[in-house]
Amino acid sequence: MFVTLIKPLARLHPRAWDFVQLVRLDRPIGIYLLLWPTLWSLWIAAGGVPELKNLLIFVLGVTLMRAAGCVINDFADRDFDGHVARTKARPLATGKISVREAWITFTILVALSFGLVLLTNAPTIWLSFGAVAVASLYPFMKRYTYYPQVVLGAAYSWGILMAFTAERGELPASAWLLFLANVLWTVAYDSYYAMTDREDDLKIGIKSTAILFGDADRLIIGSLQGLTLLLLALAGNRFELGACFYLGLVVAAACFAWEAWSTRDRDPQACFRAFLHNHWAGLAIFLGTVADYALR
């Protein structure tokens, strides 16, 4: 449905769709995976429905920063993407968009995001610098470490910290449980994603947890997902959440079980579907959180 809504953008200018693809608006899964944990945290930090201003800031901010992350990722990978079946048609890899145009796009997106952050408070503004730094660092880690997914996890979890400071003006220690849970979850689902490209990555020297885990990949992913649920349950206890929140965790656990079963043969397409499926786990936890506060 999201792609259907943005399709008319292709008619605005002959090159409009190239930029849509550059910022991955045609593939909104990254927005969802970044948005749900941020929304969990906004609701928990607010003790219910957050301020409308903060809700709008974070929804727009997530969308803009995910887009900026895609641009810097494609810049970093522009010499590799042409050798990977899944990424060879990306606009920077094909030359449809120049490096200069990509940098201009990245700068505009970050500037717009920072403009939104300026509407919050000082602690959130200071945290935003870390968000940009970690998001910019991630794409280059694939050259040097088998743990780029951990850096991605930190980038995808930074909104959790900012949500608390925006709502409360401070960062409670218990927020780090949510942060760590989301880092582990991100490593898990992005390992499924990396499994789809594992053979190509081995040929061109790109590192990932999928390569590091080897034949133990599914076992380790399942363990990471289990730890994610445990940490979320601990966070739920610390923030005095109730049955609806834990029901959301049960639904997420069912999603994780389906992913483990569906990838039993390690088929690349099945691994990609498992990656996409994590959106439903995040949504279930969000709905459980919302329901828990709404029914009090």
UniProtKB/Swiss-Prot annotation:
GO CC terms, sorted: plasma membrane
Requisite cofactors: Mg(2+)
EC number: 2.5.1.39
The UniProt record lists the keyword Transferase: yes
GO biological process, one term: ubiquinone biosynthetic process
UniProt-listed InterPro entries: HB_polyprenyltransferase-like (IPR006370), Prenyltransferase (IPR039653), UbiA_prenyltransferase (IPR000537), UbiA_prenylTrfase_CS (IPR030470), UbiA_sf (IPR044878)
Pathway(s) it belongs to: Cofactor biosynthesis; ubiquinone biosynthesis
Subcellular location: Cell inner membrane
Keywords (A to Z) from UniProt: Cell inner membrane, Cell membrane, Magnesium, Membrane, Transferase, Transmembrane, Transmembrane helix, Ubiquinone biosynthesis
Segments traversing the membrane: 29-49, 55-75, 102-122, 146-166, 169-189, 219-239, 241-261, 275-295
Organism superkingdom: Bacteria
Gene3D superfamilies attached to this UniProt entry: UbiA prenyltransferase
GO molecular function annotations of the record: 4-hydroxybenzoate polyprenyltransferase activity
Membrane topology listed for this record: Multi-pass membrane protein
Keyword Nucleus attached: no
Broad class of enzyme this protein falls into: transferase
Reaction(s) this enzyme catalyzes, per UniProt: all-trans-octaprenyl diphosphate + 4-hydroxybenzoate = 4-hydroxy-3-(all-trans-octaprenyl)benzoate + diphosphate
HAMAP family in the record: UbiA
Annotated function: Catalyzes the prenylation of para-hydroxybenzoate (PHB) with an all-trans polyprenyl group. Mediates the second step in the final reaction sequence of ubiquinone-8 (UQ-8) biosynthesis, which is the condensation of the polyisoprenoid side chain with PHB, generating the first membrane-bound Q intermediate 3-octaprenyl-4-hydroxybenzoate.
Family membership noted in the UniProt record: Belongs to the UbiA prenyltransferase family.
Designated name of the protein: 4-hydroxybenzoate octaprenyltransferase
Name of the gene this protein is made from: ubiA
